[in-house]
């Protein structure tokens, strides 16, 4: 029976007590003797479950305020003892085999996240006995079952019932790997927390004694899916997600229909969704190759989609479409009747819209749930031999943050367009130039080495689609180092420019705007995106 091992004795000691009473009761009903410690033992006893305190079992009391509970040969010998090989020495020392260990660890992450957490608080929430038991049981998975996740309780009981209270080697091995993942994540959290308090190992230690970035960067992600290939067909790939992502995202999205998401689908969908999150009004973002090619607001998402599509229908073909409100049947119909689309994502999708999209079975339809606030965290970029780590770019200016530096004041409509345009530029690859008017992108110039050429491309895009640049606002993700970009914008018909400012030649650039009768707004915030 696949090296099945019966469960006769279990040791249970958990910090997270979710489902533990029901699980322990199920074990007891199947004839399993239960050992336990501290608060877990008290909880089980209060619920009428027969339990033996570990201190009674070992003949050695808990001591040092609970620091020493399970660190005893009768415990670890029972867990580590190899059945059929160590039986004689176990019997000689009165060590009974322990067939199952159910442990999860002190809530270190929750403790250090609390306001006012002291170093002493953090230290006291470093679990010692727990990880030791977990690793011992996982090492001896040939004979012992280790359970660290409450989500596995039902699975364990179900298999025991199917196998005369036994668990297979395949299950024990799978649970053992989960246990090593559990302790690895736990130790990583501890190393990250204390690693912010010490200098780096490298030569450049200046100013990093107290840093938000730990000395070693330890992160754990869980594989969600293997992929046919990566960015290109000769590259293998997989998609990993955070253990408990809190923010609605492509990682949390539920796929309603369509082919499996590809590597590029996920990257582009993330770009589209994060951009559309910037807007409160009904909005649509269409992305191609990680760049917005059309963004617009509307009285509803249908109007927003129609206007976003109008920016660049050619690039929208085979693109990703994101909305910030529920996808309805009317909008879904407009999409599938008008264009080929790879992915549609929205906070929710109406039943009627699902029926519409179902006619195009290859279209990937996702709903990600509503978002409230953005979570903090790091962005990472792999370089050969290393990793660049930075805060997520969650910066965004409001009307009160804007500084008008030109002689001409922008109109109310220009200010509104400037803020819209600025939000879009944040998500366009640098050098980024965006033309907009009336809450709609008119032209997008992305990823050029020269800012002037990005502006030219934005103008060409607009002209190709018959869109009027005259009177538009222009956003630039970074400052203009020379006046040539402003001269080119004026020639195209731009009337207002929003940019970070901060160039050594700001005076020259502002003077150019004044010469052309343009309004110029500084944000004081840059949004490079590489």
Curated annotation (Swiss-Prot):
One of its GO terms (cellular component) is cytosol. It comes from the Bacteria. It catalyses: (6R)-10-formyltetrahydrofolate + 5-amino-1-(5-phospho-beta-D-ribosyl)imidazole-4-carboxamide = 5-formamido-1-(5-phospho-D-ribosyl)imidazole-4-carboxamide + (6S)-5,6,7,8-tetrahydrofolate; IMP + H2O = 5-formamido-1-(5-phospho-D-ribosyl)imidazole-4-carboxamide. One of its GO terms (molecular function) is IMP cyclohydrolase activity. One of its GO terms (biological process) is 'de novo' IMP biosynthetic process. Pathway: Purine metabolism; IMP biosynthesis via de novo pathway; 5-formamido-1-(5-phospho-D-ribosyl)imidazole-4-carboxamide from 5-amino-1-(5-phospho-D-ribosyl)imidazole-4-carboxamide (10-formyl THF route): step 1/1; Purine metabolism; IMP biosynthesis via de novo pathway; IMP from 5-formamido-1-(5-phospho-D-ribosyl)imidazole-4-carboxamide: step 1/1. SUPFAM superfamilies: Cytidine deaminase-like, Methylglyoxal synthase-like. CDD domains: IMPCH. Its EC number is 2.1.2.3, 3.5.4.10. The IMP cyclohydrolase activity resides in the N-terminal region. PANTHER family: BIFUNCTIONAL PURINE BIOSYNTHESIS PROTEIN ATIC, BIFUNCTIONAL PURINE BIOSYNTHESIS PROTEIN PURH. This is Bifunctional purine biosynthesis protein PurH. It comes from Vibrio vulnificus (strain YJ016).
């Amino acid at each position: 029976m696949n090296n099945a091992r019966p469960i006769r004795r279990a040791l249970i000691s958990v910090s997270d007590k979710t489902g533990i009473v029901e699980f322990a009761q199920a074990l007891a009903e199947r004839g399993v003797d239960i050992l336990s410690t501290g608060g877990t033992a008290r909880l089980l006893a209060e619920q009428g479950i027969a339990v033996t305190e570990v201190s009674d079992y070992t003949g050695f009391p808990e001591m040092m305020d609970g620091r020493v509970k399970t660190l005893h040969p009768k415990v670890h010998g029972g867990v580590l003892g190899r059945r059929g090989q160590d039986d004689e020495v176990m019997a000689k020392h009165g060590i009974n085999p322990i067939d199952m260990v159910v442990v999860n660890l002190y809530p270190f992450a929750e403790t250090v996240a609390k306001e006012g957490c002291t170093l002493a608080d953090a230290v006291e929430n470093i679990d010692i006995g727990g990880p030791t038991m977990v690793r011992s049981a996982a090492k001896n998975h040939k004979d012992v079952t280790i359970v660290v996740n409450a989500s596995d309780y039902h699975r364990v009981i179900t298999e025991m019932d199917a196998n005369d209270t036994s668990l297979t080697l395949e299950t024990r091995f799978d649970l053992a790997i989960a246990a090593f993942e559990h302790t690895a994540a736990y130790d990583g959290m501890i190393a990250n927390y204390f690693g912010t308090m010490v200098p780096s190992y490298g030569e450049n230690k200046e100013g990093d004694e107290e840093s938000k970035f730990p000395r070693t960067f330890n992160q754990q992600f869980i594989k969600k899916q293997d992929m046919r290939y990566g960015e290109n067909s000769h590259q293998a790939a997989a998609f990993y997600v955070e253990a408990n992502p809190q923010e609605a995202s492509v990682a949390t999205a539920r796929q309603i229909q369509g082919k499996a998401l590809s590597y590029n689908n996920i990257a582009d969908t993330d770009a589209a969704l994060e951009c559309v999150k910037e807007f409160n009004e009904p909005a649509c973002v269409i992305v191609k190759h990680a760049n917005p090619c059309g963004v617009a607001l509307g009285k509803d998402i249908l109007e927003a989609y129609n206007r976003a599509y109008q920016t660049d229908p050619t690039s929208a073909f085979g693109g990703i479409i994101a909305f910030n409100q529920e996808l309805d049947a009317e909008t879904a119909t407009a999409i599938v009747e008008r264009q080929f689309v790879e992915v549609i994502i929205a906070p929710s999708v109406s039943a009627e819209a699902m029926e519409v999209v179902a006619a195009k079975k290859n279209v990937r339809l996702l709903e990600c749930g509503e978002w409230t606030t953005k979570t903090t965290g790091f962005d990472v970029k792999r370089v050969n031999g290393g990793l660049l780590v930075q805060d997520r770019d969650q910066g965004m200016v409001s009307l009160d943050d804007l500084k008008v530096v030109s002689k001409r004041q922008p109109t109310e409509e220009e200010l509104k367009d400037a803020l819209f345009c600025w939000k879009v530029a944040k998500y366009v690859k640098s050098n980024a130039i965006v033309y907009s008017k009336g809450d709609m992108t008119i032209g997008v110039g992305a990823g050029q080495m020269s800012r002037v050429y990005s502006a030219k491309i934005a103008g060409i895009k607009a002209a190709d689609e018959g869109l009027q640049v005259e009177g538009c606002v222009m956003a630039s993700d970074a400052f203009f180092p020379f006046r040539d970009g402003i001269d080119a914008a004026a020639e195209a018909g731009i009337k207002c420019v929003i940019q970070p400012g901060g160039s050594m030649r700001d005076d020259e650039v502002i003077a150019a705007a004044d010469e052309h009768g343009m309004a110029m707004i500084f944000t004081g915030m840059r949004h490079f995106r590489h």
